[in-house]
Amino acid sequence: MPRFSLDAVRGFDRAVYVVAAGQLLNVFGSGLVYPFATIHFHLEIGIALSLVGLGLLVKNVSTAVATTVGGYLADRIGRKPVMVAAMAGNAVTLAGYAFVPAIAAAVGPLDPAGAFIGVSALAGATNGLYTPAGQAYIADLTDGAERDRAYSLLKVGNNVGFGTGFVVGGLLYEWAEVTVFLADGATSAVVAVVLFALVPRIHAGQRDVALRDSVGDWGSAITKRRVLGLAALNLCFAVLYAQMQTTVPVVAEAELGLSSSEIGTLFVLNPLTLVLLQIPLVDAVSDWRRTRGLLFSVGFWAASMFVVWLVYLLDLGPAAAGRHPLLAAGVVLVGLHLVARTIGEVLHSPISTSLMSALGSDGERGAQLSMLEVAKRAGFGIGSFVGGVFFDYGLAAWLWPSLIGVCVVLGLGLLTFERTLSPVENGVATEG
């Protein structure tokens, strides 16, 4: 394994660093609310947990739909306008979570659950516009292995912000609960200003193309067999991703008896692992075929699901008199899950994005990356729903071997997909 140095994060265009800093701040806002949103709306506002889950599903669907629009707009009118507009919209919709009870009181037919679902739909829409435009902007400024490193830099920035948000959010939530939602919106407003002022417009879009032709180009970009194949694989990865937000916290609380503050502290392992390993690990596999890096990722995902399954196999139930050693073992297993699934995430996210970027022309890139994001959001929604079904019907112990089965399917799918790629598309440098 090559020794990591700061050279891995040097040499990018200044705009890459500005976008990375902006995403760090934006994801800091997300970290403020991530551990506490479900607690707030279920325990404090009194919305049924199933309806909170429905709101999160609606948000993911809305994000997926908006992502297709965001990718199209990124190609048609340029990356920067879409990025700025999306962040400005986020400032309003994310802050709207603080006013869910007030919205329900002001709009007669709505109860708090309906208001929560409505705000979630709007928040998903504004959030979905940003991702394909931001990823395409970075792709425009980088190529080859440099692009993998740039996406890794974004991931590190995201997770420094996310982990810091956990800590600061805990302090804010104890002081005044709704401040975490207001602060989340405020961070997006700051990012919108930073992008508008400091990021140059390097892609002017393709305004001279007729609407009918534009739609045709967009449709062609996202209906290519390999694009759809990679999107399907990404959906399966996202089903695995979703468990950290939906079912793993339930295991930690209901099975192991951890408090919300203990769960939040334990979950810091996710961003901590990302910050420590994202750039050196991706740099270490940069000479591999991209599909082999993704296979390596699948191995860690499978291991992460297995260690949670052990909580059930070893009957590490809620703490009771005399069961403290078993409780400690259960906490270690959940911690191992978080570390292993995060290593899987470290490898998957930048490599899959680079692979999709390599499958089309510059004009198709925004739409293709939007397809990747749509698949991820769909997988999040499916993973959350399916995980909830297993728990609701008393089959929680069987969720984890089922997810290991998903990992097996992913591995076979990647080996099949690899056969369709040229060496250059798969990240292998050729001499010439």
Regions found by a protein language model. Give the residues of each.
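Cytoplasmic membrane-interface "Motif A"-like loop-to-helix N-cap segments
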Residues: 76-87, 287-299
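Residue-level signature of mid-helix packing/kink "hotspots" within the transmembrane helices
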Residues: 60-68, 162-163, 271-279, 380-381
